[in-house]
């Protein structure tokens, strides 16, 4: 039940911030990175290396961007779980 509640709030957060292209892109890239690591863990299949394997610098840059997006998404969780009356999370 808690997991469904978290999924519901996360989806609402994506819908409510869809007008902010940067935030939506950050969450999308974080999700792609999570799916890629899930594929690596389950099937030892790295989609990023498959797509950009012949260009190692692009793979490195992609992972750095995904890392920054993940950190931002983690910090952005405060806005998801704050009380409705609170507007600024410090």
UniProtKB/Swiss-Prot annotation:
It is found in: Cell membrane. It is a multi-pass membrane protein. The chain crosses the membrane at residues 23-43, 48-68. Its main location: membrane. Keywords: Cell membrane, Membrane, Transmembrane, Transmembrane helix. GO terms for cellular component: plasma membrane. This is Uncharacterized protein RP169. It comes from Rickettsia prowazekii (strain Madrid E). The lineage of its organism: Bacteria, Pseudomonadati, Pseudomonadota, Alphaproteobacteria, Rickettsiales.
């Amino acid at each position: 039940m808690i997991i469904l509640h978290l999924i519901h709030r996360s989806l609402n957060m994506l819908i409510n911030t869809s007008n902010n292209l940067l935030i939506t892109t950050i969450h999308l890239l974080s999700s792609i990175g999570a799916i890629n690591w899930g594929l690596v863990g389950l099937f030892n299949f790295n989609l990023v290396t498959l797509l950009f394997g012949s260009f190692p610098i692009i793979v490195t840059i992609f992972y750095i961007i995904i890392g920054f997006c993940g950190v931002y998404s983690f910090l952005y969780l405060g806005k998801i779980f704050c009380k409705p009356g609170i507007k600024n999370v410090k």
